[in-house]
Amino acid sequence: MKYLLDLILLLPLLIVFSIESLVKLFIPKKKKSVAGEIVLITGAGHGIGRLTAYEFAKLNTKLVLWDINKNGIEETAAKCRKLGAQAHPFVVDCSQREEIYSAAKKVKEEVGDVSILVNNAGVVYTADLFATQDPQIEKTFEVNVLAHFWTTKAFLPVMMKNNHGHIVTVASAAGHTVVPFLLAYCSSKFAAVGFHRALTDELAALGRTGVRTSCLCPNFINTGFIKNPSTNLGPTLEPEEVVEHLMHGILTEKQMIFVPSSIALLTVLERIVPERFLQVLKHRINVKFDAVVGYKDK
């Protein structure tokens, strides 16, 4: 009975906070300044990471750029410098924990304390479970989620000391709703979303509310990693559109960034509608892409 009473007493807060959220939809939140911040972006040698670096370069930040591809990261750094920013490229394999820690030490010594960390590096293998090799599964988790632990452990302490900073997790809509033939990828992105949510709550529990968190969850992006993607949710997203949403989310300190926003509705439906209806809905959404299928029906 006591718990029921406590729940009833919380209802006014639910109403107030719901109205507050509704009002915020129509009143744009002021964007914060990131001038002078040291921004580290993993996977900055191409795609979302590269375009995100360009946007931060326009905002008077100092950039630390990580990627496994030396040519790609140097091209990104050169463009960032043309945009007026200091850019420090590092060749780093984000699947290797000790390499991450070693590079983090160099960053602190040569550049300074990172105050905005964008965990963007990622890999994807489009295949069913049987066609996905064991090393590919390991690599998927090493890059897509374990690297987030290592980079955050390296750079978060100073942010917590200053009660100032921002940790950005680049995840995926596949971190909320599953897609066949992306088993390893979906699993790793669910873990990345969980990392973001758990870290957010942990920072709050420790009283470090000045360290903000954001998580990007887009639909299919036209970056070439997944071949011939299509879905009835809409056209394949262009990287520029996704980065525009990402930057807006970071600068307004939005915790969960869905692109398109309809993804948020789908994640809610998955939790409340009957499973049979959900299967019909997924059939109508009709997600397609080129994939390798190793299972043979004998």
Swiss-Prot record:
It comes from the Eukaryota. Keywords: Endoplasmic reticulum, Lipid biosynthesis, Lipid droplet, Lipid metabolism, NADP, Oxidoreductase, Signal, Steroid biosynthesis. GO terms for biological process: androgen catabolic process; steroid biosynthetic process. The active site is at 185 (proton acceptor). Substrate binds at residue 172. Its EC number is 1.1.1.62. InterPro entries: NAD(P)-bd_dom_sf, SDR_fam. One of its GO terms (molecular function) is estradiol 17-beta-dehydrogenase [NAD(P)+] activity. It catalyses: 17beta-estradiol + NAD(+) = estrone + NADH + H(+); 17beta-estradiol + NADP(+) = estrone + NADPH + H(+). GO terms for cellular component: endoplasmic reticulum; lipid droplet. Residues 1-21 form the signal peptide. NADP(+) binds at residues 40-64. Expressed in the liver (at protein level). Also expressed in the intestine and, at much lower levels, in the kidney. Gene3D superfamilies: NAD(P)-binding Rossmann-like Domain. Its main location: endoplasmic reticulum. It is found in: Endoplasmic reticulum; Lipid droplet. Belongs to the short-chain dehydrogenases/reductases (SDR) family. 17-beta-HSD 3 subfamily. Can convert androstan-3-alpha,17-beta-diol (3-alpha-diol) to androsterone in vitro, suggesting that it may participate in androgen metabolism during steroidogenesis. May act by metabolizing compounds that stimulate steroid synthesis and/or by generating metabolites that inhibit it. Has no activity toward DHEA (dehydroepiandrosterone), or A-dione (4-androste-3,17-dione), and only a slight activity toward testosterone to A-dione. This is Estradiol 17-beta-dehydrogenase 11. It comes from Mus musculus (Mouse). The gene is Hsd17b11.
